[in-house]
């Protein structure tokens, strides 16, 4: 990749630093998409020994690129995102990926296709980490930032995505317990 091509790609990806997500940080500000992507990549790094048969380097690459479409559309929370939103994001993302030089263009497109199919262990791990990180982040935020429907969502979100792995199922149960403990400690503030 020529320096000018790298810089152009980085300038596009930089938008994720300012693209906020629905969730707040423990410090009380909106989390950025870049921070979310970084942390699921960190989760993949920490969990590499739990999945010795998986290509965790590939999982990490998936984690790093999974939300790049939000450079063009912004973040839409999962509970608000429509099929049209997903289609628009995918079209804009694939248009951008097509503008990248080889072999990056082909690798990214192959990763996105694999992630969408959710047939490989690597894609399943990435998707589970994506869901888990969102719930962990909500547990770290002040409960006053939770919307009413999130009390129930905190207890169930991502369960189907972790079911393939005993380790991730146990992690989901631990995160669920953190949610229950948080609600008990900070109180149910639903309106």
Regions found by a protein language model. Give the residues of each.
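Active-site helical microenvironments for divalent-metal-assisted chemistry
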Residues: 1-191
